[in-house]
Amino acid sequence: MQVIVALAALGSLAAPALGFSIPRGVPVSQSMIDVKLSSTGNSMVKATITNNGNRALNLLKFHTIMDSNPTRKVSIESEDGKEIQFTGMMPTYKEKDLKPSYFISLPPKGTVEHSFDIARTHDLSRGGKFTLKAEGMVPIAEENGTEITGAAKYHSNELHMTIDGEKAASVENAFGIVKRGPLTRINKRTSIDMQSCGNSQELQALTAALKASAQLSSMSAQAVSQNQDKYMEYFKDPQYMQTVQSRFQAVAQESSSTTGGGTTYHCSDTMGGCEEGVLAYTLPSQNEVFNCPIYYSDLPPLSNECHAQDQATTTLHELTHNPAVQEPFCEDNGYGYERATALSAEKAVQNADSYALFANGKLNLITLMLIIDPD
């Protein structure tokens, strides 16, 4: 019976959304906000965000140019066209119960500035000439509200900077080298930092999430070729089918490897990245994943709701951010169903949430519950 249900689920992936998703049907503006980049020092950048509309807006900061965490806010290319390695964090944020502090209020025609040092999240020690630009989509709430009612795309100007490599190297990186305790492969899975797992309940929850991530990823790898309509909904172009399938297979292997994986998973935050609203985060430059307290307190192990977050798919999402799982690793190009399915094929195939959303079909979750706990 379990096998029959599992096969049926492969052809019936739903269309859920993770994270602070933009509700279906809300308007997406191409010109509601303007973002201008300017240089204010050797590696300091100022983003000036302008509300072009005639009404006040509440702009959600998460995964945007305004994010206060050391996330990727701009793309940086050297003079020879090579992308500069990102050394910051890739967080997964909680969708529900958004707080006013997560937003920036912007009056009509008003502006707000956000400054950041790109040397904290990129290796610029070689110095020289660099080209920066920013693009993305900002979830929007009405004035004084926290319910997402729309979104605004932004594309900044290109900023050309000449950076002193020695000065850039003297800037403290947002995250140093991760110090690990003893490593253990729990039930032959990815390496877990046991020193970070002082709470036995957290260790048990992480172990279960890895098992569920492995099974969801394995089923999704099969679904890529068995449900092409659903594949096209998320990834747009059949030429990337093998890439998507191989990434799901890589995540499944990393979650349940019999030979040991390339990532290290931490039950708790040992690097100070768990700011308010962060469920978990990855340091892709080091192949390290960290769970935050609300990963355990606010998420169920598995949800039977299509649009809900849970521990299993959050773990799956984080693993796609690691180059040790598959290169190039996934970015956060679009978060939530509306943003993920609006991406181009080239962006979608490299978007972490596209994989988590595809895997997080309601029937897949119900099937997995039956497989894990048939009683």
From Swiss-Prot:
Cofactor entry: Zn(2+)
Keyword set, alphabetical order: Cleavage on pair of basic residues, Disulfide bond, Hydrolase, Metal-binding, Metalloprotease, Protease, Secreted, Signal, Virulence, Zinc, Zymogen
MF terms (GO), sorted A to Z: metal ion binding; metalloendopeptidase activity
Catalytic activity from the UniProt record: Preferential cleavage of bonds with hydrophobic residues in P1'. Also 3-Asn-|-Gln-4 and 8-Gly-|-Ser-9 bonds in insulin B chain
Cell location: Secreted
EC number in record: 3.4.24.39
Gene3D superfamilies found in the cross-reference section: 2.60.40.2970, Collagenase (Catalytic Domain)
Residue ranges of the propeptide: 20-189
Residues that coordinate or bind Zn(2+): H317, H321, D332
Disulfide bonds: C197-C267, C274-C292
Superkingdom in the source lineage: Eukaryota
Catalytic site: E318
UniProt GO cellular component terms: extracellular region
Signal peptide positions on this chain: 1-19
Role of this protein: Probable secreted metalloprotease that shows high activities on basic nuclear substrates such as histone and protamine. May be involved in virulence.
Family: Belongs to the peptidase M35 family.
Record's protein name: Probable neutral protease 2 homolog ARB_05817
